[in-house]
Swiss-Prot record:
A GO cellular component annotation in the UniProt record: cytoplasm
Protein name per its UniProtKB record: Ribosome-binding ATPase YchF
Domain TGS: 281-347
Organism of origin: Mycoplasma pneumoniae (strain ATCC 29342 / M129 / Subtype 1) (Mycoplasmoides pneumoniae)
Ranges in coiled-coil conformation: none
Pfam families the record matches: MMR_HSR1, YchF-GTPase_C
Domain spans labelled OBG-type G: 2-258
Binding site for Mg(2+): S15, T35
Record lineage: Bacteria, Bacillati, Mycoplasmatota, Mycoplasmoidales, Mycoplasmoidaceae
Disulfides per UniProt: none
Domain of life per record: Bacteria
Family, per entry: Belongs to the TRAFAC class OBG-HflX-like GTPase superfamily. OBG GTPase family. YchF/OLA1 subfamily.
Length: 362
């Protein structure tokens, strides 16, 4: 299962956020390194399309697709050199597919900040710099192994060296690998498992009071300006403390409480989970029947047989054709039989690619 790692400096709200995401009470304390071993949790990816299909079909069971989050203990400056148990933390980050940077965007004198000041840009740069330094070491080591072969004329080593040399130069100028190479070259670098080649999301941990008017949070404004300058998506505003309190409620209870607080439009964790799911390259297709309506995750670019293999390996091996219909057409017509009458149910073969939001009757 693909996963996202939650990283950040100590005491920015990482573990509180993780607790809310998974509704799992992990160790939370107001001091650095309260979390040493990474905690992992599986979350549902809420999809309104699936819920609408379920309301139409009324199955015995509704199953959302899932996604894995990992809470990785707090990094500090010097982690790439092993400071603050940094080697262990960096090793944990290597195991995830997406990095969620949590930065603090609220003032609270009761909660000690590791740098004694609230500066989300500075916090973000510290973490990224540690990841860059770790990548420099990996690339340097690899270049050292292939340079002699490349200079002697070995074609494969020469091509790899020509790819790595500018990457190393860019890293030394504090640029992330993500912004140094195209998608084709990024795949060639996959075996090195470079940290700054992973997709990045930034989570701005704000106070509950800020949620009603985020434009008036100077820390968030500063952070988003910085991210825009560096071709990174805007931060996702989340109040980790509020989310932790809401996590014990069902969807209706959550919405009622937010409405009472005047925060009906607040998406918070749902936005984070959906954005992470998409950023990691995952899409969904749906299966439906009276017993179950279910969402299935698949990687962008997959063909129909690979998607079928998510349901059962036999389906992938024996795949020939499948009847599909788009979810919105099925929902609008309220009936699979009516959709067939109108010729909207299509028979597709092995060449069907990226079956996003297609529905398959089981």
């Amino acid at each position: 299962m693909l996963s996202a790692g939650i990283v950040g400096l100590p005491n920015v709200g990482k573990s509180t956020l993780f607790s809310a995401i998974t509704n799992l009470q992990v160790e939370i304390a107001n001091y650095p390194f309260a979390t040493i071993e990474p905690n992992a949790g599986i979350v549902n990816v809420i999809d309104e399309r699936l819920d609408k299909l379920a309301s139409l079909i009324k199955p015995d069971k509704v199953t959302h697709t899932t996604f894995r989050f990992v809470d990785i203990a707090g990094l500090v400056k010097g982690a790439s050199k092993g400071e603050g148990l940094g080697n262990q933390f960096l090793a944990n980050i290597r195991e995830v597919d997406l990095i969620c940077h949590v930065v603090r965007c609220y003032e609270d004198k009761k909660i000690v900040h590791v740098n004694n000041q609230v500066d989300p840009v500075f916090d973000f740069e510290i973490i990224v710099n540690e990841l860059i330094q770790a990548d420099i070491e990996v690339v340097n080591t690899r270049i050292g192994k292939i340079k002699r072969k490349a200079e002697s004329g070995d074609k494969q080593s020469k091509e790899e060296y020509q790819l790595l040399a500018p990457v190393l130069q860019g890293l030394q100028q504090n640029q992330m690998v993500l912004h140094l190479v195209n998608e084709v070259d990024l795949k060639k670098l996959k075996s090195l498992n470079l940290l700054t080649a992973k997709p990045i999301l930034v989570v701005a941990n704000v106070s509950e009071a800020d949620l009603s008017n985020l434009d008036h949070n100077p820390h968030l404004t500063q952070l988003n300006q910085f991210l825009k300058q560096h071709n990174l998506p805007h931060a996702i505003p989340v109040c980790a403390l509020l989310e932790n309190e809401l996590s014990s409620l069902d969807a209706n209870g959550r919405q009622d409480w937010l409405k009472e607080l005047g925060l009906s439009d607040y998406q918070g964790l749902n936005q984070l989970i959906k954005t992470a799911y998409d950023a990691i390259g995952l899409w969904s297709f749906f299966t439906f029947g009276k017993q179950e309506v279910r969402a299935w995750a698949f990687k962008k670019g997959w063909l129909a047989p690979q998607c079928a293999g998510e349901i059962h390996t036999d389906f992938e091996r024996g795949f020939i054709k499948v009847e599909v219909i788009s979810w919105n057409q099925l929902y609008e017509l309220k009936s699979l039989q009516e959709a067939k009458k109108q010729g909207l149910v299509r028979l597709r073969g092995q060449g069907l690619r990226d079956a996003r939001w297609w529905c398959v009757s089981l």
